[in-house]
Curated annotation (Swiss-Prot):
<protein>
    <recommendedName>
        <fullName>SPbeta prophage-derived uncharacterized protein YosI</fullName>
    </recommendedName>
</protein>
Length: 44
């Protein structure tokens, strides 16, 4: 089963990804730009 990953900001799903590395890179970029913590979680 292929995993999906969600990018979350303040508990809200912002975007979904098929690739964990891409999701992580976007989370780092979004956090640097906004100053607000973002996180990546697996979606089941």
């Amino acid at each position: 089963m292929k995993m999906k990953y969600g990018l979350y900001c303040m508990g809200s799903l912002v975007n979904t990804y098929d690739d964990a590395i891409e999701a992580h890179n976007d989370a780092v970029y979004a956090q640097e730009e906004s100053g607000v913590p973002h996180e990546v979680r697996e979606i089941q």
